[in-house]
Amino acid sequence: MINYRHIVFCLCVMVVVDSRLTPYLAAIEQVDPIVKIVLPIVGRFDPEEFVTSWQGNNPCEWFGTNCLEGIIIGISFISLNLIGTISPHFADLTSLRVIDLSHNRLKCTIPFEITKLKNLTIVDVSYNQLHGEVPRVRGIVILTERNPNIESTCLLVPSPTRNKNKPTVLVLLLGILVGLVVAGGASFGFYLYRIRKQPKRLQEPNEAVTLTQQQSSDESLVSDESYVISLQLQYRVLRRFSWVSKGPLLLTRQLKTNQNPHLPYM
């Protein structure tokens, strides 16, 4: 037999519980999406500093937030004695322009995720205890004064992005070094080639002088032979006509030129 009393009791309990949970469920559903983004950021710090002051559903009314037309454009947590690390969830606030976390006790690295913020201009993390590399992004000024261990290795939050870029940089430097070595070797080889070619060039004028001397000597021989032939020819001609003149035969030396043709044989 069905116990109706038990069923009625269960239904009454469910109604009471539902009526009590409804406001809480509604509050959770009505939470501003920005609140859901900001809370994980604060969770990396000491939350006790924010529990008493951060109330309500409008983050623009909370201390440390700067808004423009209902949009958070700045986070300023200066001298709050915050401990912990800087949350990468800052990158979820896409409208951020300024992040000021100076004069605290924050440790470890500056997350590289903040470099994705297109509107970000200033990040002030001076006077903290940060370690690791500082992101280098054009258009973003990162102030790191009085962080004695900045740029050193932090084992808690490694940076896989930078580690992947290191082999590329090494390959680039190696390629430049090899190119310089090859260029230097080629220049040195060309220099040696020029040195070896110079003695040969210096000997060329001597050879030219030798050839000139040989040519001049050959010409002198030809001229002497012509002179001998010319004398013989004159002698023979005068001998043919010796009956005209009773005096001794006279020979004259004639230079061989184009204007003095040989006398015909008679």
UniProtKB/Swiss-Prot annotation:
LRR repeats lie at residues 93-117, 119-143. Residues 1-19 form the signal peptide. InterPro entries: Auxin_Ser/Thr_Kinase, Leu-rich_rpt, LRR_dom_sf. Glycans are attached at residue 119. Residues 20-169 are extracellular. Residues 191-266 are cytoplasmic. The chain crosses the membrane at residues 170-190. It is found in: Cell membrane. It comes from the Eukaryota. GO terms for cellular component: plasma membrane. Keywords: Cell membrane, Glycoprotein, Leucine-rich repeat, Membrane, Receptor, Repeat, Signal, Transmembrane, Transmembrane helix. It is a single-pass type I membrane protein. Belongs to the RLP family. This is Receptor-like protein 5. It comes from Arabidopsis thaliana. The gene is RLP5.
